[in-house]
UniProtKB/Swiss-Prot annotation:
Organism phylogeny: Bacteria, Bacillati, Bacillota, Bacilli, Bacillales
Swiss-Prot/TrEMBL keywords: Cytoplasm, DNA damage, DNA recombination, DNA repair, Endonuclease, Hydrolase, Magnesium, Metal-binding, Nuclease
GO MF entries: endonuclease activity; magnesium ion binding; nucleic acid binding
Annotated InterPro entries: Resolv_RecU, Restrct_endonuc-II-like, tRNA_endonuc-like_dom_sf
Binding residue positions for Mg(2+): 85, 87, 100, 119
Cofactor descriptive note: Binds 1 Mg(2+) ion per subunit.
Entry GO CC: cytoplasm
GO biological process, one term: DNA repair
Name this protein carries in UniProt: Holliday junction resolvase RecU
Record-listed E.C. numbers: 3.1.21.10
Coiled coil: none
Species this protein is from: Bacillus anthracis
UniProt-listed HAMAP family: RecU
Biological role stated in the UniProt entry: Endonuclease that resolves Holliday junction intermediates in genetic recombination. Cleaves mobile four-strand junctions by introducing symmetrical nicks in paired strands. Promotes annealing of linear ssDNA with homologous dsDNA. Required for DNA repair, homologous recombination and chromosome segregation.
Xref: NCBIfam families: PRK02234.1-2, PRK02234.1-5, PRK02234.1-6, recU
Length: 200
């Protein structure tokens, strides 16, 4: 399927390297992506009346559809209607929460090129309206997850724009962020960290 941006440029998904390092999987996360783990976590929170958080749909304009059978439709070409903001939003303890989920195979840093300007602007707007904005970053080689408040992401973004580093070091993420615990239910208990960081 061909997907295009509003300006007509083709969207090319980053290709995955052919050789990937062998990763130890625990029984709690075998074969799951960060997005799948968060979706399952949010389902748990919703079912247990803890929080109401959902994945935002990507706004697409479908251009070409093939119908190989009467009961099946295959989308062949689509455009992004508008730039997406962040991955998830919802409500917890009466506060609006909004966050992005990112993974990296880097060992020592997280590249800021994984963010787009419109995402940074969106997080600024959430903060300006007294909402809670943050990023969940997964270092896949270590199977470590951190919750980092958006104000730090914005600071590092501004540093890059004034000639500084184009990445956030893992040490900076450890210093300013919070390590997330992983388990069975919920898989990624980010609400526990929200309680500590924003509600204590």
């Amino acid at each position: 399927m061909t997907i295009r941006y509003p300006n007509g440029k083709r969207y090319n998904q980053a290709s995955q390297p052919h050789k990937t390092p062998i990763k130890k999987h625990t029984y709690s996360n075998r074969g799951m992506s960060l997005e799948e783990e968060l979706n399952e976590t949010n389902e748990y929170y919703l079912t247990h009346n803890i929080a109401c958080v959902h994945k935002k749909p990507t706004p697409l304009q479908i251009v070409k559809v093939d119908y190989p059978a009467r009961s099946a439709a295959v989308v062949k070409e689509a455009y992004f209607k508008q730039p997406s903001t962040t991955d998830y939003n919802g409500v917890y303890k009466g506060k609006y929460i909004d966050f992005e989920a990112k993974e990296t195979k880097n060992k020592t840093s997280f590249p800021l090129q994984n963010f787009h300007l419109h995402q940074i602007e969106h997080m600024k707007q959430v903060i300006a309206h007294n909402g809670i904005a943050f990023v969940i970053i997964k270092f896949t080689l270590f199977d470590e997850l951190y919750l980092l408040d958006a104000k730090h992401i914005i600071t590092f973004w501004n540093r890059q724009n004034t000639g500084g580093r184009k990445s956030i070091t893992k040490e900076e993420i450890v210093e300013h962020g919070s390590l997330l615990s992983c388990g069975y239910h919920p898989r990624i208990d980010y609400i526990r960290v929200l309680d500590t960081v924003y509600f204590s």
